Amino acid sequence: QRQMCIRDRVIFGEYNPPTFDMKDSEKWVDMSVAYLKYLVCDLGFTCIKYFNIFNEPDGDWASTNGDYLLWKKMLFLFHKKISEYPMLAKQVKLAAPDVVMDYHNSNSEYDAEGWLMQTIADADDIIGVYDLHAYPGQAEVRSGSYSKLLASYKNHIPSDKQIILGEAGYKYWRTADSLLMAEYNRRLVNHPYTKGTDCNMLCYDYFYGLDMPLLAMEVMNAGYSGLAMWMLDDAMHSNGDSGKPEDIKIWGMWNILGEEVFNSPKEEELRPSFYTWSLMCRYFPSGADILKTEVLDGNNEIYAVAGMYKGKLTVAIVNIGKEDKKINLSLPKEMTSALLYVYEEEHLNKDENGFPLPVQTGMKLNSYSNTIKSNSFIILTDLSDE
């Protein structure tokens, strides 16, 4: 089982049934919902708001193997069972379909977008939130073209529903990312604790701390309501859930068992992406309104997102170019006691735990001008840390 936390709202769900031959078993449904009820109604985990029945059911790696009709049948069985417990049904709604964007299993009649559209047609009245997974390439996102794909999916969503990315990260199999893929493969050779089956070996790199907030900006500006970075901690997931330490999935912001299990204390250190991702999560909290932003000179190396939360403003900007960029920022309101955080490869202001510290505090601003270094990221906010 797995969960995705959106501040005080948790998506809880099944990865697959205990055995693949239980994929259409009502016994599995009964067991699963009984445990969900135990968590929510008996133990009081009221933070659980959504439930997902299969991980990536369109995948050829899933027990469903792209069988939409089987998945739909089970979706309605789970809904029926949840409905038998009024308190649970009031608290928890279904998240679906959890399919992988830009993917088509040859065994399935639908690609991911078609699966989403069919889910809306068949089951919108029982869906609480629409949920997708996304693993674009670096060139795709940095070129700005990924926003078109995001918009295509978002345009199908009914106006009274939200859409989120329940998993998001980067994969480098596309031709435009061939140099990154070559480096990925080089790092796998004789690696002591992964075979590279499902990893991002570049999650250790400084640039990943630019690419993840950039992806978040594109998702936020496309009208999505949240995304979860895959993943938090390398120690949480091995290939096939085997528990074997020689083949873990390396995607995280650290590995909490680096010393104890993997004989590498360095793996426990916070990776660069933690710096920027923690800031995005802190200053664009659940309930923030995302504002329309525009880069007036059409510069395709500067990306920005802005949000308002309880009257406080946050602006995040990333420069993915090779040159420093002068920016002049027009603000919709005065910022009082603003903080400035900067992510630069040679300038990462941190406390003793490695957590980000602002480089400026107490700023009072009606506008903002500065030079953003090449390959860097900033957050400007007057939202309190308290």
PLM regions and their residue ranges:
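Active-site cleft segment of glycoside hydrolase catalytic domains centered on the general acid/base Glu
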Residues: 17-128, 133-152, 176-180, 210
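Short, small-residue-biased leader/transition segments that mark boundaries at the very start
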Residues: 1-6
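Carbohydrate-binding surface patches
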Residues: 296-334, 343-345, 375-379
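C-terminal beta-strand-rich structural cap/linker in extracellular carbohydrate-active enzymes
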Residues: 356-386
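Aromatic/acidic polysaccharide-binding cleft in carbohydrate-active enzymes
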Residues: 170-303
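Glycoside hydrolase catalytic-domain groove-lining segments
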Residues: 128, 135-195, 215
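Structural recognition of the beta-strand scaffold that forms the well-ordered cores
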Residues: 9-13, 49-53, 93-96, 128-132, ...
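C-terminal accessory region downstream of the catalytic core in glycan-modifying enzymes
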Residues: 329-362
